[in-house]
């Protein structure tokens, strides 16, 4: 099984844009926990999961919109009420998902994910910090930062 960020780097190296969908808040019964994420490609292909079923379908549809708008989106999902009862979902919680466009044309972003790959390949300790906000453009170089164990940052 490949590492999530290695997959992102691989797609960027191939010139493919992706949307990272990550659960940033979860309360009650939900299919996955905070921090869980998946990668959505422009054709709708999903690598990984944020929970499957109706939730994953909605995340996929929102991601396709993020590709068009080229800016981040915060989405709140209420896994409660009649709508959920009419599906096969067994959960009854609340989930917030951050959808982040990652484009292969953003040189700073490509450098960060290449450095993440290097850190993983070398078993270096590193922390990837992502700014979470609605409307962050795909070309903003301040959307994320990588801090490696030696104190250097990218």
Which stretches of residues belong to each language-model region?
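Segments forming oxygen-rich coordination pockets for charged ligands
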Residues: 1-154
């Amino acid at each position: 099984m490949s590492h999530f960020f290695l997959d992102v780097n691989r797609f960027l190296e191939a010139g493919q844009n992706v949307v990272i969908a990550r659960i940033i808040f979860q309360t009650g019964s939900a299919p996955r926990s905070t921090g869980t994420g998946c990668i959505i490609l422009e054709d709708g292909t999903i690598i990984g999961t944020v929970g499957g079923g109706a939730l994953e379908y909605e995340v996929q549809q929102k991601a396709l919109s993020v590709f068009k708008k080229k800016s981040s989106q915060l989405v709140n999902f209420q896994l409660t009420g009649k709508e959920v009862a009419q599906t096969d979902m067994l959960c009854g919680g609340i989930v917030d998902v951050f959808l982040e466009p990652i484009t292969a044309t953003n040189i700073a972003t490509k450098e960060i994910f290449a450095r993440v790959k290097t850190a993983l390949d070398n078993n270096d300790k590193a922390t990837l910090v992502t700014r979470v906000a609605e409307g962050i453009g795909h070309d903003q170089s301040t959307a994320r930062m990588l801090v490696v164990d030696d104190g250097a940052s990218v």
